């Protein structure tokens, strides 16, 4: 996943 955005997963 991304560090700042959870929806990047």
Swiss-Prot record:
Which keywords accompany this UniProt record? Answer: Amidation, Disulfide bond, Ion channel impairing toxin, Secreted, Toxin
Please verify whether the record's keywords include Acyltransferase: no
Expression tissues: Expressed by the venom duct.
The Cysteine amide modification is found at 9
Cellular component (GO) terms are: extracellular region
Compartment(s) of residence: Secreted
Q: Tell me how the protein is altered or processed after translation.
A: Contains 2 disulfide bonds that can be either 'C1-C3, C2-C4' or 'C1-C4, C2-C3', since these disulfide connectivities have been observed for conotoxins with cysteine framework V (for examples, see AC P0DQQ7 and AC P81755).
Please tell me where this protein is predominantly located: secreted
Superkingdom of the source species:
Eukaryota
* Function summary: Probable toxin that inhibits ion channels.
**What's the entry's take on its domains?**
The cysteine framework is V (CC-CC).
Write down what this protein is called. Conotoxin Am1099
Q: Please name the source species.
A: Conus amadis (Amadis cone)
């Amino acid at each position: 996943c991304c560090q700042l955005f959870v929806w990047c997963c």
